[in-house]
């Protein structure tokens, strides 16, 4: 998928709340790979782990799909008779993903612009949420996880990845050092951090695991960690 280099915060500006708009969509692949350590590995892990939960004719949700990185990786590993509903509330993201899917001739990914907290879910074998829950208001997270648990068929799983809130400041410093090593300036890092303050509210890892347990997931297994970026397989 064509994309530009992320320079959104390279110049001094009056910082506004981060939005998944056209400007973000145009640079998103570069942004997320340079901002999330191990992102490519996470997508590969979710694809190979997730494929084990998807049977012939199975059904998958990719919630908060953005430009469909997880969906595109997964569809190479699952039966062609299985379908993936890639859902995001950002029109700029879904429009680009729909155009890519059509142009690439990928027939088993269906793209939908919708609010995942109000979606009319149908039974699924696998649900993927990669760095999505952190953008849902904290007071709505438990109810959403309960709905997802109820959506999954017996033997199904939720693959969840989140940026977690560390217990001290060292992890933030290490993450910002990682971003600097990817070519982001200190000004860009600071302005991006400020833009996310009112938009992304992270939980501690233990809080996320508690939310999953209380939602009714019976087996919760960590499968990924790079700095404060974590992934879990939550099975039913």
Locate the predicted segments by residue.
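Conserved alpha-helix/loop element of class I SAM-dependent methyltransferases that forms part
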Residues: 38-56
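A short SAM/SAH-binding and catalytic strip from SAM-dependent methyltransferases
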Residues: 125-140
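Conserved class I S-adenosyl-L-methionine
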Residues: 57-66
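A short glycine-rich, Lys/Arg-flanked "PGG" loop and its adjoining helix->strand segment in the class I
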Residues: 142-154
